[in-house]
Amino acid sequence: VSKVLKSLLLTALLGVTGLISGCGDLTVLNPKGPVAKGQSDLIIYSIIFMLVIVLTIFVLFTIMLVKYRERKDISNYEPDMHGSKKLEIFWTLIPVAIVIALAIPTVKTIYAGEEAPKVTSHKDPIVIYATSADWKWIFSYPDESIETVNYVNIPTDRPVLFKLTSADTMTSFWVPQLGGQKYAMSGMTMNLYLQADEVGTYKGRNANFNGEGFADQRFDVVAQSEKDFKKWAKETKASSPVITQDIYDRLLIPGSSKKKTYSGTHLAFVDVAADPEYVFYAYKRFGYEMTNPHNPNTKSTISDEPMLPVRPVTVTNPQFERHDMKPQIIKNGEGYHEDKHREDEMKKMEEDIQTNEFNKKESDDAGN
């Protein structure tokens, strides 16, 4: 009896523990913006839809167990087995219909998230570059000329276009109460529209494991009224220190960081999405070397001051759409250097040189 009692108590304890573990705030189902609301509605719809299917199956299963169970009054039951094309077609179409019923709203919600919310699509979105760097988030406001670390202020009732990229490892940008996650990857820029309808502070984080500092890569989204946001932006720009290339390169060194605020943005001298190898030069500048995290005896000594000059880049490209500021990495007449140019860039440079030489020859021949 004691063994049975112990087993029951252990089972009850594990059950209570499991129930308590689920008592946290389900932020995904507590949306504070139109993007998150659409995704929350999709989740609830999918759960209810699948519960109906599961309950239907269990009801049918129970009926079959009860109706066709072995009974004393029916000793020999011979099932009437024969083929039925109608039934076969019917139960083949059922899963097809289920997939369609789930796929249509899912696809609609996904595509709706690729554009500004319809309720505020007439408003000009605020554009914020969100750059992931182990293990911190760097937010750049090109219009307001502000840069923040591990927190971002946004106005309410206005679409926000986050341009996501990563300076190093792949991460995932996620603010559960404002919208679903999207990957931030090196060498590319991903667009993510979000919007907050209520004033407040919302928690954001990296949702993709990327090493020992993963748990610390969190940030706050501070939603303010339009008036308060403009006031904050004006005061922040006037009172914060100017971000320099030295400061930015130091931020790229792996490690956690407190909240920081700067005037200006790093987009003035580099866009890591267009120059994904920039981070490695930043490592060299401060003497950082990647080590084995599983070996406590391997450490990397980081210099307080840069040991190499800044990497020269030029950011002037009017051909790109608004805020897509790409560095002109290859300059006219500049040679190839493995620390600065990729193979495809070298090929492009050679093609340009050949084209220029051909045009010059054609011009000279025409003059003669």
Which role fits each region the language model picked out?
Residues D25-L42, Y68-N368:
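Non-transmembrane, membrane-proximal soluble domains of secreted or membrane proteins
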Residues V1-L9:
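Bacterial N-terminal signal peptides that target proteins for export
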Residues L19-G22:
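C-terminal motif of bacterial Sec signal peptides marking the signal peptidase cleavage site
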Residues T56-R71:
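Membrane-water interface of transmembrane alpha-helices
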Residues L8-T17, Q39-T56:
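Alpha-helical transmembrane segments
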